[in-house]
Amino acid sequence: MIEFGVATAYGTMKRVLMHRPGEELQKVTDDTLEEFHFQRPVKKEKFLADYNGMLELFQSHGVETVLLTDVLKSDDDAMSYIRHRPNMTYTRDLASVFNSGAVLMGPHLKGRWGDQWIVGRALERLGVPILGSIDQPGFLEGGGVTLIGDDIAAAFPLRPGQRSRDPSVERANHG
């Protein structure tokens, strides 16, 4: 069996899909804070410094970091979309990757709806099968999913109503 993801939340990470934030951070203004779920406009230099520190930490531990925009650079539609999506940096929320493939998450925040399909395009280009997706009216984000065994996950809300809704969990059953 080809393996794509991790079997548990505590194993060794070998490869990770990430998005380096760019011009889309300028979309976070006082008028869009609620839509994109930010507390204040982004201090881009600090945000990028923190991101680069995390990227370097992964790489220093031997983790292969795959950048979303590198995978999608020839996809003009995806690249245009990303330029308007300041939360794209948080790729963990958008898919859960199992040994047999990925399940695309269903973001709760309206300002994130559709972002999972961009990550799905990248995963497909990387050869990761898409096993299913969480669709409205349900929602479930990657922060509410913990892998506990081969192709077995526990889904739970981190904060009531913020990360999952029961129909999401039912729809995530792909096997």
Language model: regions and residue ranges:
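The feature marks the mature, well-folded catalytic cores of soluble enzymes
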Residues: 1-175
